Amino acid sequence: MSVGFIGAGQLAFALAKGFTAAGVVAAHKIMASSPDMDLATVSALRKMGVNLTHHNKETVQHSDVLFLAVKPHIIPFILDEIAANIEARHIVVSCAAGVTISSIEKKLTAFQPAPKVIRCMTNTPVVVREGATVYATGTHAQVEDGRLLEQLMSSVGFCTEVEEDLIDAVTGLSGSGPAYAFTALDALADGGVKMGLPRRLAVRLGAQALLGAAKMLLDSEQHPGQLKDNVCSPGGATIHALHVLESGGFRSLLIKAVEASCTRTRELQSMADQEKVSPAAIKKTILDKVKLDSPPGTSLAPSGHSKLLPRSMAPAGKQD
């Protein structure tokens, strides 16, 4: 089985690293395409031994499972480019927030009468094999196609099948969830520093507290509220701290954050349906422009049946 990523950003890197660490896919069986070979994630993928190319169609050609790992509003343009190259063997997996199965199938059926499409929502902790993934299968995807994706994604964390109409809510909860956790951890560490702890120790203690709390919950059958109550002794420090959180609307803010992420996901779908995209994003999707912008000496060299960018040619990436 070969795996391809259209897009070589944070998600592609996280999944590729997770798959190779789990041993479910070898690095040389993975290909990623990107118009920008200066990305830090491209450099990291190269060091892992992943095949890289400027050409999305080449990634399609050399993949059995094809992940669309680009921004939602880019998806229609990518599909227009690769639709003619999709074959019956391909499993097309969209990781784009808000992009529906039907919108992808509509683009692909112009060339492939029964495209196998799966929509999934995952998160960046797949990089350490602690991701949270849900997926929904399309009209023509078979049971075994869903099982294959579940096998892949279960190797990098929790994975389960859901109805497609639940995926937007999942995006707001676990898709965006790591960002909520990192923000909370940053604030906890700031509190520790304010009270005299060294920054490094404060971050480590805060991270361990969140990790331990999550593991306690997953390993038990208790409600999180009960586990919270177990920490609070009468008149103690923790219940006083929780009073401050409740006074500040802590719970309400988290609920609103999930709702806001979910709502924005649906707005992104509307943008994708209308095929609206910024000029800067269009520039990134036009391969002819990429070729014109490529510096001398970065022509693609053959490797087997594919033309891959030599590892030595691309400079170390910078943060996107």
From Swiss-Prot:
GO terms for molecular function: identical protein binding; pyrroline-5-carboxylate reductase activity. The keyword Oxidoreductase applies. Pfam families: F420_oxidored, P5CR_dimer. It is found in: Mitochondrion. NADP(+) binds at residues 6-11, 34, 56, 69-72, 95-97. NCBIfam families: proC. This is Pyrroline-5-carboxylate reductase 1, mitochondrial. It comes from Bos taurus.
